[in-house]
Each structure stands twice: as structure tokens, then as C-alpha cells.
Amino acid sequence: MHTNAAAPDRAHRLTYVLYDNLATPFNCVMLALALLLLALDAHADLWFFFPVLLNAGLRIGYDLSAQHAIRSVCSRGGQRTEPLSMRRRPTELKAGLSHMLVVLMFVAVPLAAWKGFALVRHGSAPREAVIYAAGMIASLVPAAMVLLISASLLICARELRKRRVVAASLYSVELLAHCDAVCFSSDALDAFAESKTLSRLREEGLALYFFHSTEADASDPFICDARTLRTPDEYSSAVQAFSVFSHAGGAERAALVQELQAAGHTVAMVGSLDIDAAALHRADCALCPYNGARSAVLQAHLVLLSDTVNALPAAVLEGRRAINNATRTGELFVKKSLCSFVLYLLALIVRLPYPMTQLHWSFTGAFTVIIPAIVLAFERQYQPVHGRFVSNVFYEAAPGALLHVAYLLLAVLLSRVLGLTSEMRLTFCVLAASAAGLAVLWHICRPYDRLRTGLCALMTLLLSAALVLFRGRLGLVDLPPAGAYAVSLLGMLAYPLQHVSVRIVERVGRAVRCRGKKRRLAVPGLLERDEGC
């Protein structure tokens, strides 16, 4: 009887996991490109689809294994049902990554179509134009970045599993890192809380609130009877003045969580009872012990597999690690995408020759993007998280993209001035792109430690050696003395000019923020007091 009743639930959960991980705009566009190339019998150009398949398989595999782990431990704890967090509200990292990929695809698809039509007008075969356009889209939309971010999240999820915490989905790992307030249901907390854990949470900058269903300790100076709260103003005043609430029922707990969110907090909720379900559902991050009520476990993003909350500080740090690594990885890949987009656009509008082929982009990118991103994606970075993922990635990637574009355009112009041949121009551009890529890598890896310093030094040596060893296969030739001097000068100035690019982007960003504030603020005298405006 129980097996028959559970079968539809398992099918529903499997359908949800497949839909959540497969039915994304990124996967749909990549699948359409792959099918198009298959129809054109261009199997050699399907390399970009393998990271997409690996990423989808990794996410689906983790989500299903997490459900199985939660289901197993809950059945040992007396649960008859199979819990799973089914809330469709995406996490900050997941939503930001999806929006960023949509923006890149929104830019890449029209640009690739424009380039394809231009090739057809100039006499190229339609099949070749379509294959070239598909390659443009694949190069502008970094599928490898998505795979590396998922792999980094998986490492963090495994670290949490060692501490007896299971994330209901792969992207749930990051949720607790965004929170600056944690609400505890004291009915569950009193049995297993430790003062050291609560002290560590406070040290990490988290404000703690406690909800009691009965009378709390009268000696506590910060106690509020939740039964006396009626209006939103009373709730707003209460969360600012008190941290302990007695006689808090389910409605009161949900209202208090909502009021904390309205006050600008990102709220995590730890609860195990039926009366916690509404507050858990409303919280930005829901945590529940495995032996909690079914209605509470169903809302959990993170399930505690032991009767303690000692793993909460570790969950905060692992979430920060996941977000910081994803941001660092995104900077490297988005920098290349922005640079490629600008160069493709200039090649179409101004009719400048495109500086390098996809082979040369891949070759230099292997040492300045791919290998460093793999290493940095698994680094332990526990700095607090600030801002939003998309804005942080684009803001940090913009200086590197600006330096790359400036260097490649300068290489093309100097090649014309010096009268270099097409082979010499290609060599000039490859060397300029290598210098810019290494400068960006050295800048991104600050502050330096042994790992980052060794990584940057190793990539510099390997790229320099590879350019010499594979110069024949890459089509590189010797430059005349003037060209060699120009390349040497660009190489020496690359790192200082990267700092100049950062300053330019900072000033532009500050000007944009000030203009936005001027539009929002109509009261005279307010803008003069705003820093930087």
C-alpha cells in the first residue's frame, strides 16, 4: 500500500529534477545548435556540447543522490514519506548564472546570424556560414564555465555531507552564505544547541533570533510576547528591538520572518515542527533536522542529518566558498566572451580583420582561462559575500576585456603601420593577446599566496614555452625588429595597463551609480552628501 502510494511521488520528483536541470534557456539553445550541426554533418564542431551534457548529468546525479540520502535517513528516523524541497524559487547563483547566459545568448545569436548572412553575401556556401555562426555562438557562450561552477558546487556539497548536512539541490549549497539573520525555533533548538555554535554564527556577522511557542526565560532582557503583535508597524518595531519571541505560533513566526526580510535582511530559518512550516517556506534558506515534521522537512533547502546545529558555521563557509569560486571562474570566462563580442562587432561594422582564429583563442585561453579557472574553482575562499553574482562578474571582467580589446586593436593598427604581412599580423595579435591574458590572470589572483603565485608563474612559463614549441602548427612567424620591439613594449606595459583599465571601469561604474541616484532622489541636498557623487 505504501509502495503504491509512494510511486507517483517518486515519478513526480524525478520529473521535477529533470525539468529543473534540463529545461533551461542555455540547454535549449545549445541543444538546438548541436542538432543543427548534426543535420549539417559537422560532427567535429560538436565539442561545445560535451560540457553541457556533463553539467546536466552532474546536476541531475547530485539532486537524485541527495533525495535518496534524505529519504534514507528520514525513514530511519520514523518518517513514512520521502521529503524533497520542491520550491521553484531559484537561488541567487542559479538565477544570476541563468540571466547571464541569457544575456550572452541574446547578444551572440543575432551577431552570429549577422555574420552568417555576411559570409553568404560574400560568396561563402550556406553550410559553411551556418557552421561558422554556430561556432561563434559556442565561443561567446562559455559552456565550460557552467560545468566548472557546478563542479565547484559539488565539492562544497561533499564537504557539507562530511559534516552531516545534505543540500536538497546542488545550488542550495550557497543559500546560507547570503543570509545575515538566522531564526531558530527554540522548540527544536533547546534539545541540541551549543553556545559555541551560536557564538561562531555571531562572529560571522549573523544576527540570531529565537522563537518560543511557550513562555521564554523571563530573565532575558530581549523578550517580546508575540501575542501582543497585531499590526505590521508593531512587528517592524519588535524585530528591531527584540531577539527572543515567546508564544510565537506559526502565523507569528512567518510574519516575523517576513518583517525581517522587509527590513532588508536575508533570513535563514531553522525549525522542525509543523508550526515552523510557514516560516520555513517564507525564509530565504530553510534548514530542518532529518527527524522533523514532514511539513517542515518538505520546505528544507538544507537537511541536518544529526541532532545538532554545530554544522551551521561550516555551511556558511562552504556557501561562501562556492559563491567566491563561481565569481572568480566567471570573471575569467566572461572576460573572453566580452572581448570576442566587441571584436566580432567591430569586424562587422568597421570591417577590421578579426585578429585571431578560434584555434588561437583556444590555445591562449587554455593557459590564461581554462587551467587557471579549474584550479581557482576549487580554492578555499571564505570571504563574506557582497553584491549580486551577475553584476560582480561583469564588473570584474570588464577591465580584462577592455585590456584585451585595446591590445588586439592596437596590434592590428600597428601591423598596418609597420606594413606586416598577414602571418606577421597574426603572430603580433597572438603575442599581444597572450600578454593581456597573463596580465589579467596576475591581477585576478591577488592577493597572492603560494598557490596563486605558483599558478601565475607556471602559466606564464608554459604559455611562453608553448608559443615557441608549437609556433609551426599555430602559423606563427618571426617578426621584424620594429614588431618585436612593439610586442616587448606591450608585454612590459600589460600589467600596469590592467590597473589603468580597472580604474577606468571603477570611474565609469561610479558615474553610472551616481546618475541612477540622481534619477531616484528628487530632494535637493541629498546628492551632495552621497560619497563619490
Where are the model-predicted features located?
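Structural signature of FAD isoalloxazine-binding scaffolds in flavoprotein oxidoreductases
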Residues: 72, 76, 278-282, 297-298
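Hydrophobic core segments of alpha-helical transmembrane domains in multi-pass membrane proteins
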Residues: 33, 46-55, 132-133, 151, ...
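Membrane-embedded transport module
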Residues: 90, 99-108, 115, 132, ...
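Hydrophobic alpha-helical transmembrane segments
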Residues: 40, 47-77, 89-181, 211-212, ...
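Cytosolic catalytic headpiece
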Residues: 102, 125, 130, 171-285, ...
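Non-lumenal N-terminal regulatory segments of integral membrane proteins
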Residues: 1-111, 213, 227-230, 242, ...
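Alpha-helical transmembrane segments
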Residues: 59, 373, 437-441, 467, ...
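Juxtamembrane/interface segments at transmembrane-helix termini
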Residues: 63-67, 159, 447-450, 454, ...
